[in-house]
Curated annotation (Swiss-Prot):
It holds the Pfam family CbiN. InterPro entries: CbiN. Its main location: membrane. Belongs to the CbiN family. The lineage of its organism: Bacteria, Pseudomonadati, Pseudomonadota, Gammaproteobacteria, Enterobacterales. One of its GO terms (cellular component) is plasma membrane. It comes from Klebsiella pneumoniae subsp. pneumoniae (strain ATCC 700721 / MGH 78578). This is Cobalt transport protein CbiN.
Length: 93
């Protein structure tokens, strides 16, 4: 019980502390950081290809990113659940 409370307190701290650390800081994704670093290192760099689909807004881009992550997590956990169920079935035999 004590271990559970300590873990819950740590999770709560990890969720709350980022709001107070670097308050008012700018959030940027890794794509933007990579693009700025490429401009510093090689200002004449030209991309090899253009995206097949450019989302209409940042919200749609975030939605597609989230859906991609959710689908990947669903596939991974389906495989893990299937393997665990199969192992339990084999243990009964």
């Amino acid at each position: 019980m004590k271990k559970t409370l300590i873990l819950l307190a740590m999770v709560a701290a990890l969720m709350i502390l980022p709001f107070f650390i670097n308050h008012g800081g700018e959030f940027g994704g890794s794509d933007g950081e990579a693009e700025s670093q490429i401009q510093v290192v090689a200002p004449d760099y030209q991309p090899w290809f253009q995206p097949l689909y450019e989302p209409a807004s940042g919200e749609i881009e975030s939605l597609l990113f989230t859906l991609q992550g959710s689908l990947g997590a669903a596939v991974i956990f389906y495989i893990l659940g299937y393997a665990r169920g199969r192992q339990r079935r084999d243990d009964r035999v």
